[in-house]
Amino acid sequence: MPQVDPELFDRGQFQAELALKASPIAAFKKAIRQAREVLDARFRAGRDIRRLIEDRAWFVDNILQKAWDQFDWSEDADIALVAVGGYGRGELHPYSDIDLLILLDSADHEIFRDSIERFLTLLWDIGLEVGQSVRSVDECAEEARADLTVVTNLMESRTICGPERLRQRMLDVTSTAHMWPSKDFFLAKRAEQKARHHKYNDTEYNLEPNVKGSPGGLRDIQTILWVARRQYGTLNLRALAGEGFLVESENALLASSQEFLWKVRYALHMLAGRSEDRLLFDHQRTIAGLLGFEGDDAKQAVENFMQQYFRVVMSIAQLSDLIIQHFEEVILAPEDEAPPQPINSRFQLHDGYIEARNDNVFRRTPFAMLEIFVLMAQQPEIKGVRADTIRLLRENRHLIDDNFRNDIRNTSLFIELFKCKIGIHRNLRRMNRYGILGRYLPEFGFIVGQMQHDLFHIYTVDAHTLNLIKHLRKLQYTQVSEKFPLAAKLMAKLPKPELIYMAGLYHDIGKGRHGDHSEIGAVDAEAFCQRHQLPVWDSRLIVWLVQNHLVMSTTAQRKDLSDPQVIHDFALAVGDETRLDYLYVLTVADINATNPTLWNSWRASLLRQLYTETKRALRRGLENPVDREEQIRQTQSAALDILVRGGTDPDDVEQLWAQLGDDYFLRHTAGDVAWHTDAILQQPADGGPLVLIKETTQREFEGGTQIFIYAPDQHDFFAVTVAAMDQLNLNIHDARVITSSSQFTLDTYIVLDTDGDSIGDNPVRVKQIRDGLTEALRNPADYPTIIQRRVPRQLKHFAFAPQVTIHNDAQRPVTVLELTAPDRPGLLARVGGIFLEFDLSLQNAKIATLGERVEDVFFITDAHNQPLSDPLLCSRLQDAIVEQLSVNQEPDIKLSRISI
């Protein structure tokens, strides 16, 4: 800390200002304000961050000393002002808590009570954020014995004012000789760290990470130092290196990583104007600029900054694992430790952990750097890797070069890992954590720490990839197979399950390289297969899966699965049932590994329907596609049979059906046709809109709640309907809009509640929805189609230009309008209003919300029920949608192509 820094705090000038004023508060506030401005300016100028946070602690020391001197403490008084916690370490960020201990010799505080209260009141009045406790030495011992946090804070202490002897006595009575021996302290801190990591989903890669508490954050470094201090006395990172826990290169890496996080934390506090350790979207872009990160645009700069952030915290997590493992071996070593058990000539088992038998194993036999992970997968009883061996792996990974990558021993070992019955994910994750995976597969190294700046992808690309492999492995577990029955069944019967793991490893490997990542990844996957000498059939399947890993989810979410042509085209693209099985399992794992909130009952039912219909088409033969007329006849025959058995007059049925048109029978099952028909025929002529709600278990709509609406057609009907559903907190996932020849609308919506589940059989909720829709649709002209709602905080930070693509469907007489736009409350109602303005009819819609963006597909016709044919009209329509959805967006809106 500096001894003198007049720019930051001029003691003489401050003393003079105190003397001039009746109250000291103004002088203190002025000094604090000026110091903050000086330090912030130094930060913006790029001053050394370690010096900055030490300078702030030095400044606060001076302020506290001056405040302490305002009160009458006798020179030999048994009272001291002690800095504890982070402030005790001499580290203070702009709005960090200033933790103080007012330490007394005796538990009798009465003699000092008035002065202590007035001192603390002064600190609050001048604007210092202090956390204070008033304790005697004995009370410190009592509190510390019962509370891990208290003893930890007291270990990091400095005397600011008063006699140092009190703090020394306090340190003595709270030492390992009296409480918290190093073994107990280590076990408690390790458990505390595990609980903290679990709070942050056990990943360094949260979208809005906590710089202090997340895995790989500043708290992990502090945990290392706390354990070391309890075991060895006063230590810092350099002293840890001296004790053999760190080599010099690791010490330098840990120190530079700590300084990077300090910069981020300092910037967070400065920008937020308060204590803030969450790296929120609100601040990521600004901090990227402050720290000098650049890119082709602001989004790229943020992604570059966050990639650096994630690589830094991953380095900290790696070294934290290494040091904690080292502590465990030293602190928890049993007195009667059993001798190591040989595994082979290169490795042995030491207290349940694998270790190299000598320091030259990896240098002399580099293939052992892959063999160690295969051994752990083959022998799951191995707990992990000894600390010295982790260090040897890190020190020798530079030996992984092109010769290593092409050595048949190494390629064979890597493939062997994928054939192990268990441990694939765990050991790939270890390989990534120790820096081996990215060296062996340089293309994988490129995606390490690569974040996509959106709400859809909540993990970095490497974390998502390993997560996908984890999901594939979990399909073997009973509790998981119950949630994903079809995927688990198919996974169990895949002829070569190792191939889906390899495809999973490569499916997103092409991201971040400015092109179609599926195509780029397929090229990399093919090179991988050739280098590892995989058979032709295996190679072709892996490459095909990587190239087409998005096709199934895209088809399920964006195409009309009731259209036989859609199923036929998808079946043609897949080709055979084996590929279909692999693709379905990969797709399920991919969605769940991308973002847990993406998987819901509706998305599951869409994929299952597409799988089942495609399998049926493949078994029937691609040369024999389903005939539309035959499908209509089958649906009508089955529905009529249900109705007649229920006592409905066939003549009434035929009369109604004659008004509905072919599309209605193509889009609905026989059961739904019978359900709708029966309700419509019983509806009084002046009974108002008919609203039916069903928790359906039919294959086509399984997992969603079906809402069927029958009412006289009006121009603004769709806009009002979706606005009313928005007010009812319903998420629309599918819309099927049909107008009968008698000008009645027959609309079917598949909805989920906001939690992603179907409505269920809750009669109160069903009645609320039915009544709300009926009331809104009784007088559509009186219902506001656009209802203002607050945009969620996170969505505000992902503005991008809406994109609209318009083209005519090759198989059906409709125009397809594809919309990609930022998700906003009331978006569908706004689109419906534009369709109304342009005199367009909506025939069908597929609605998908992916994080902060919507990817919706609308099937529309003109006023004459024909596809759009006027390019000028399409251009105006496109401009209107972009303009309407760009309110409060960035001005550089790009229009997408139009093809008619």
Swiss-Prot record:
InterPro entries according to UniProt: ACT-like_dom_sf, ACT_dom, HD/PDEase_dom, HD_domain, NT_sf, PII_UdlTrfase/GS_AdlTrfase, Polymerase_NTP_transf_dom, UTase/UR
EC number from the UniProt entry: 2.7.7.59, 3.1.4.-
One GO molecular-function entry: phosphoric diester hydrolase activity
CDD domains associated with the record: ACT_ACR-UUR-like_2 (cd04899), ACT_UUR-like_1 (cd04900), HDc (cd00077), NT_GlnE_GlnD_like (cd05401)
Needed cofactors: Mg(2+)
GO BP, one annotated term: regulation of nitrogen utilization
Region (Uridylyltransferase): 1-342
Annotated Pfam families: ACT, GlnD_UR_UTase, HD, NTP_transf_2
Record has Magnesium as a keyword: yes
Domain of life: Bacteria
Function per UniProt: Modifies, by uridylylation and deuridylylation, the PII regulatory proteins (GlnB and homologs), in response to the nitrogen status of the cell that GlnD senses through the glutamine level. Under low glutamine levels, catalyzes the conversion of the PII proteins and UTP to PII-UMP and PPi, while under higher glutamine levels, GlnD hydrolyzes PII-UMP to PII and UMP (deuridylylation). Thus, controls uridylylation state and activity of the PII proteins, and plays an important role in the regulation of nitrogen assimilation and metabolism.
UniProt remark on domains: Has four distinct domains: an N-terminal nucleotidyltransferase (NT) domain responsible for UTase activity, a central HD domain that encodes UR activity, and two C-terminal ACT domains that seem to have a role in glutamine sensing.
Name recorded for this polypeptide: Bifunctional uridylyltransferase/uridylyl-removing enzyme
Organism of origin: Pseudomonas fluorescens (strain Pf0-1)
Lineage, top ranks: Bacteria, Pseudomonadati, Pseudomonadota, Gammaproteobacteria, Pseudomonadales
Gene: glnD
